[in-house]
Amino acid sequence: MRIFGTDGIRGTINNYPMTPEVCLRAGMALCFLLKKRLPHKPKILIGKDTRISGYVIESALTSGITSMGGDVYLVGPIPTPAVAFLVKSMRVDAGIVISASHNPFSDNGIKIFSNDGFKLTEELENDIEKLINDKDFPAIRPSARELGKAYRIEDAQGRYIEFIKSTLPKDSNLEGLKVAIDPANGAAYKITPTLFHELGAEVITINDKPDGVNINKECGALYPESLIKIVKETQAHFGVAHDGDADRTILVDEKGNIVDGDFILTILAEELKKERKLKKNTVVATIMTNMGVENYLKNAGIKMIRTKVGDKYVVEEMLKGGYNLGGEQSGHIICMDYTNTGDGPITAVQMAYIIKKNQFYLSELIKNIPRYPQALKNIKIPEKLPKDEVKNVIKKLSQKASTLEKNMRGRIIIRPSGTEPKIRIMVEDENPERLKQVLDELEAVANMMLS
């Protein structure tokens, strides 16, 4: 069975592949491969979100790495993009994030970054997977003198906060702004509120008391209802919501409207173009990005390139084409001038700076950006359904979608989720009634085939 998915290793804790045994062997395999390539003892940094299972996985990875002669640097709860930054800042050889992002607390995962701050290549993931599954690995283990050590790094959050502040123009601040923040009881529960406070904003924080099981629970980027309520009640200028590992951000304007990644990407693109900093006047988005946004950017002289869903594909296209801005509707925004991955706190601060600089309310920044009606349905795949049958269901649904599209002024996207056992159906159409009818029809067909 395949261990690595589209975004590292992920699954329900204590169920394959998210078991202590697999994590131990993953740590051993990573360290072994690094030792073959490096002239020195491997140094590997480990960060995590706030899930209770993070302790289990952190201990297993640390044991695996140190048993193979590598040193481990433990930074505790910290956003995924902070690990990408710290890997470069601390000159270590690799970084590991223990997180299942927006998934419930019962899930967890492992993402690995190489020493340049980019996610591991598929080739290296395959090499690690082969060693995990190799019963004869490791044939030789280090002697007692060659074992690694584990160190706890106390100032990691402070380093990351100072880095984010450095992305703003010198002497700039956010004084005069009132900002509501929902870190989803996740990895940024201290960082984003502290960051905005140090920049001079008035900060109201909710869902910032993680207990190991409340991460993403009816809060954060996927459940913005409580943030909408607090923004309205406190008359905040806007609200910020992250997911569990804070690699994404969505905003809420002062009227309580959700400002997703499509809007954020558009505002950032226009601002960069105005400052002549948008490379090749191009942004990279995914197939999920709204057609209305694409048309709006086109009229503004900005080209959009689409990729498959997943920030790794956005990053790949950005590197290939030499672009510096990309993102997803879900709120993964990659500002390549500062970071190599989706970074929720950086996105939030950059947007706050634009709002203050232009002296506009967020609602005014988005009011002219058109959106075609769009709806998404997630169809759960039965646990024991073979992969071939899932592929067959998607194929038949896609054929049905092609027929339905002939009578639409829009599009249909059907794809398997890369992180959960679900089929995702997205329908976009200028006519909201037709959109609902098409979505209901496809859902009925999918449920019939999966029952």
Swiss-Prot record:
Task: Spell out the Gene3D superfamilies in the cross-references.
Answer: Alpha-D-Glucose-1,6-Bisphosphate, subunit A, domain 3, Alpha-D-phosphohexomutase, C-terminal domain
Q: Which GO terms describe its cellular component?
A: cytosol
Q: How is the cofactor bound?
A: Binds 1 Mg(2+) ion per subunit.
EC class name: isomerase
MF terms in GO: magnesium ion binding; phosphoglucosamine mutase activity; phosphomannomutase activity
Phosphoserine: residues bearing it: S101
Question: What family is reported?
Answer: Belongs to the phosphohexose mutase family.
Tell me the protein's name: Phosphoglucosamine mutase
- What gene is this protein a product of? glmM
